[in-house]
């Protein structure tokens, strides 16, 4: 058995592609418009992955629908070569870092559809670095 893809439902293709491609750095590798089913599937891959497995499938239903109660997903996880650089790039592009990488290992952000993305440092944690360092409060 091998991992193929993770599917998340999105409400706005443009906002989602801006987030996942322009801000996070994924690339679109395939798109399927299904007129009979009234939906579009967009498959995205990480920069250095093959284009058949480990994909993110964005599902856009043409008829408007709000996704509540976990109907759109939990979280996605990606490993990166430098968590600080990735978080800085995201922040500079207007993305809120919900859980900063203070430990040099893990961070969380959210997509425009509220999907949580876990960003993990590849290999060992990086040493603490500004502006992400933990501040000690002296009383």
What are these regions (language model features)?
Residues 1-17, 73-76, 123-136:
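N-terminal beta-strand motif that seeds the catalytic metal site of vicinal oxygen chelate
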Residues 7-53:
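Core segments of cupin and vicinal oxygen chelate
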Residues 16-21, 90, 114, 139:
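Conserved active-site tyrosine of GNAT-family acetyltransferases
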